[in-house]
């Protein structure tokens, strides 16, 4: 590989073992390819340049700045010739103009006006013939009518369509001509004036009277016998046709603004039109929830009223029972327990035994509701070992004074009933529970718990 001397190279590299400079890597690649950058002849400085003194040159700025400059045609080729063709990067784009610069044809071309179609103005009659000299006329094609989605509504014509019908042009033949100067319209070469279509005489009176409000008709037609409208009515009809509607949804019958505003006010007063469907659903849900809440509160109040009445009745029964019990316990009652047949009573005393069983059932239900039994299986086993054989219980009549307080009598009866229930539980542990009795006991406990919960829930809002 023939390389020039290193003194002619225009390359620099750092002396580090591990170099991270991209410029150093680029110089290494150029040297490996055998294309190092070489110093140009213009860059060479003479050896005795340091001995010479600096020179100052004066230039006339007016000659260089204000002189007319012409754009050179070969600016791109000159700039490319200054570059070194040895580099591989620039050799790829040799012969191709850069994308950023415009083409020669675009540089040399002058600003040209777009070609416009010429209208023969000799055949047409212009409104102002004096201004025709410096005027450019543009032809606008006919606009296609856009059909609305809703077929029920009547389609209103645009301003361009109105101007076409005013000039009396056919649908496909004609085209509207517009001049760039404001307020100038050029009619077609063969205009047909049909102004009779827009006069109020052309329309029948019944069609005009239905479209107008009644108050306006009373003012314009004081005599109902007139067949043709007066001059004032013609003027007002023309003005109403020219005015655009206030809204797109305005009905055709509401021509006057007062009538439209009254219709709009009526629609706002109706709640069905004021609220959309989504708000209606939310409103219905809220009202239903409020009604349900009121019903639930009424039911709870009724329960609160019922529960104290039940309690009062139970207290009255408890007070009335001690007297009957004291009278019923005059005769001694003997109850014998047999492990095979259970409780047995002696003959002739069945009535007294029935009363005693009713009292036992009442006391056991009260104890279950207030004091829930918390006895485990081990406790039952202990009682099973302590019990020994059948036992005989004898309840003798209490010959106490009737004038004693009722509370003492109730306490004595409660103590006796506790003893009876305790012995009964021991015997049932020995013999084993029956499945039907277990179910009855569970059902009684659940009913008592439900009543207590309802009563506690009813008392909470009263306390608050």
From Swiss-Prot:
Residues 352-367 have a biased composition (Polar residues). Coiled coil: none annotated. Residues 290-374, 445-464 are annotated as: Disordered. InterPro entries: DUF4647. Residues 303-318 have a biased composition (Basic residues). It holds the Pfam family DUF4647. Residues 293-302 have a biased composition (Low complexity). It comes from the Eukaryota. Residues 445-454 have a biased composition (Acidic residues). This is Uncharacterized protein C9orf43 homolog. It comes from Macaca fascicularis (Crab-eating macaque). The lineage of its organism: Eukaryota, Metazoa, Chordata, Craniata, Vertebrata.
């Amino acid at each position: 590989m023939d390389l020039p001397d290193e003194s002619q190279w225009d390359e620099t590299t750092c002396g580090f073992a591990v170099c991270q400079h991209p410029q150093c890597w680029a110089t290494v690649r150029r040297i490996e390819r055998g294309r190092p950058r070489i110093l140009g002849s213009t860059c060479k400085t003479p050896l005795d340049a340091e001995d010479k003194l600096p020179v100052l040159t004066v230039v006339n700025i007016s000659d260089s700045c204000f002189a007319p400059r012409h754009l050179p045609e070969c600016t791109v080729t000159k700039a490319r010739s200054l570059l070194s063709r040895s580099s591989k990067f620039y050799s790829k784009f040799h012969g191709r103009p850069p994308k950023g610069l415009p083409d020669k044809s675009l540089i040399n071309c002058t600003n040209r006006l777009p070609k416009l179609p010429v209208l023969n103005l000799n055949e047409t009659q212009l409104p102002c013939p004096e201004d025709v000299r410096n005027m450019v006329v543009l032809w606008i094609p006919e606009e296609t009518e856009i059909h609305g989605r809703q077929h029920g509504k009547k389609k209103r014509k645009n301003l361009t369509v109105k101007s076409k019908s005013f000039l009396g042009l056919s649908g496909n033949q004609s085209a509207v001509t517009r001049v760039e100067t404001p307020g100038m319209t050029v009619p077609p070469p063969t205009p047909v004036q049909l102004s009779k279509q827009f006069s109020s005489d052309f329309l029948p009176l019944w069609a005009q009277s239905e479209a107008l409000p009644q108050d306006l008709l009373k003012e314009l037609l004081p005599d109902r016998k007139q067949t043709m409208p007066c001059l004032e009515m013609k003027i007002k009809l023309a003005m109403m046709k020219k005015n655009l509607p206030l809204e797109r949804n305005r009905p055709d019958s509401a021509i006057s603004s007062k009538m439209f505003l009254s219709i709009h006010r009526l629609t706002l007063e109706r709640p069905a039109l004021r609220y959309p469907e989504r708000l209606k659903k939310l409103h219905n849900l809220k009202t239903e929830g409020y009604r349900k809440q009121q019903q639930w509160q009424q039911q709870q109040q009724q329960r609160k009223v019922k529960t104290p009445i039940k309690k009062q009745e139970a207290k009255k029964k408890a007070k009335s029972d001690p007297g009957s019990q004291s009278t019923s316990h005059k005769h001694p009652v003997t109850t014998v327990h047999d492990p095979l047949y259970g409780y047995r009573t002696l003959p002739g005393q069945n009535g007294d035994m029935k009363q005693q069983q009713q009292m036992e059932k009442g006391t056991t239900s009260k104890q279950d509701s207030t004091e829930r039994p918390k006895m485990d299986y081990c406790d039952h086993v202990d009682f099973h070992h302590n019990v020994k054989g059948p036992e005989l219980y004898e309840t003798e009549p209490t010959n106490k004074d009737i004038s004693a307080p009722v509370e003492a009598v109730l306490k004595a009866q409660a103590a006796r009933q506790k003893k009876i229930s305790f012995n009964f539980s021991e015997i049932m542990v020995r013999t084993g529970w029956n499945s039907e009795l277990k179910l009855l006991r569970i059902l009684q406990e659940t009913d008592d718990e439900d009543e207590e919960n309802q009563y506690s829930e009813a008392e909470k809002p009263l306390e608050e």
